[in-house]
UniProtKB/Swiss-Prot annotation:
This is Mu-like prophage FluMu F protein. InterPro entries: Phage_head_morphogenesis_dom (IPR006528). Involved in virion morphogenesis. To phage Mu protein F. Pfam families: Phage_Mu_F.
Amino acid sequence: MNITWNWYEQLESAHARAFTVAKATKAEVLDTIRWATEQAIANGTGEREYIKKLEPMLKELGWWGKAKDENGNEVQLGSPRRLRTILRTNKITAYHAARYAQQMENVDEQPYWRYVAVNDSRTRASHLALHGKIYRADDPIWQTMYPPNDWGCRCRVEALSEYAVQSRGLKISSSDGEMEMEEAVVGIDKDTGEEIRTTVSKIKTDQGEMKVGAGWNYNVGSAAFGTDVAVLRKLQQVKNRELRQQTIQAINNSEARHKAFADWVLANLGKRGASARYMSAGLVTTEIAEAVTEITQGGKNAELVLVMSEKRLAHANSDKHHEGGVGLTAEEYASISRIVANPSLVLWDTLEGHNNLIYINQERTIQVIVDVPNKHSIKPKEKVDAIINAYKVDMNNVKRQLSGGNYVLLKGKL
């Protein structure tokens, strides 16, 4: 959740990584708008009802009408028009993020993607430059030109199989060497008069030139998938170890993230045909990552981003576990991200063939097994650490394993 005065302070992939509302200065305001927007999208609420419900809440919080910003400039806060834009933008980005996820899951069967514009009087001429063009799913063009590509963009992507392409004699294009980048002005700083600039990508085709709108130079789907990876890459540039550790812990403690993980568990637990798609369960902290590297003498290095796939959730929820009395309840599986965030114990399993991290909640006698780094198939592919199992644990056995040297205590006390 990010707070900002100007939308261009949250350019590109931040739109997919954080619910952002320009000029929201209170976390309570932002949380209220986010909650109402998520509910509206989930329930199919119309714009009028959305605005009618949200306006009195925002007025009560003092986020409505005109006000002075921190520099004394007059700014427009909440308004029906702004709320309408918020709802429309979040609806379209949510739709395309979900569509991207589905297409990535099926990319082996449908490895070609076709750009489809609406092609009516409202369609931007630049977007028509890509209409009907087909590129491989792994072509770099989709990193920045997967819709939406501007405010109000209605374009979409259609996935095609090898058979469909060959049987219909369709032409496959490549963006290799064709993509260009240029600067675009997205705003003016009222205090300094300085132009606020960002980078946008463009490509020329035989149908014209396609240029992404300022602030949309990213893929909403891959950005949502790659949230934690991108955050970690940024955090590794922070030289202050304590600050880096505090930031990771703050991310791990996010209630919104815990709820998202719990919702994912409840939606996938017991589902037939579990896939390799995954959900973030948190981040491996700096101290634990350093301990893993030290204890393995550099043989193992945590990737820091911790995920759980549908397949591993299904494995943890196996009949074997439940028949053996170690299976968890749905609520306990949903609590895995909380155990990762604040474990009672963190251990390293030194047994040959294991070499895993173990997160334990002593009160609930639950252990979460982590593969560092992940060796299993996941979609989309990414360098991560992965939760491979979770079940009830006998704490007396944990003590025996520690005494015998099979486990090494990295954090916590028995």
